[in-house]
Amino acid sequence: MPSVKVKENEPVDIAIRRFKRACEKAGVLSDVRKREFYEKPTQERKRKKAAAVKRYKKKLQRESIRTTRMY
């Protein structure tokens, strides 16, 4: 869990903004959303495999674009 030390004479708004940024960097919100509902192990494997296929297709597409440019 991220923590923020409030400096002396620092407005609360700025401290809250720093805390939000720290939470975002740590991935707290995405983790909470991911664990909001139970996901069966088979569904999790299916989702991860689909994401891997998507990344692979995107990588192939980027590589094909690099090789076809002739300028």
From Swiss-Prot:
Basic and acidic residues: compositionally biased ranges: 61-71
GO annotation terms (biological process): translation
Annotated region described as Disordered, given as residue ranges: 48-71
S-S bridge residues: none
The keyword Ribosomal protein is annotated on this UniProt entry: yes
Ribosomal protein in keyword set: yes
Pfam entry (one): Ribosomal_S21
Compositionally skewed regions (Basic residues) per UniProt: 48-60
Superkingdom in the source lineage: Bacteria
InterPro entries, A to Z: Ribosomal_bS21, Ribosomal_bS21_CS, Ribosomal_bS21_sf
Family to which the UniProt record says this protein belongs: Belongs to the bacterial ribosomal protein bS21 family.
Listed NCBIfam families: S21p
Protein's UniProt name: Small ribosomal subunit protein bS21
Organism: Psychrobacter sp. (strain PRwf-1)
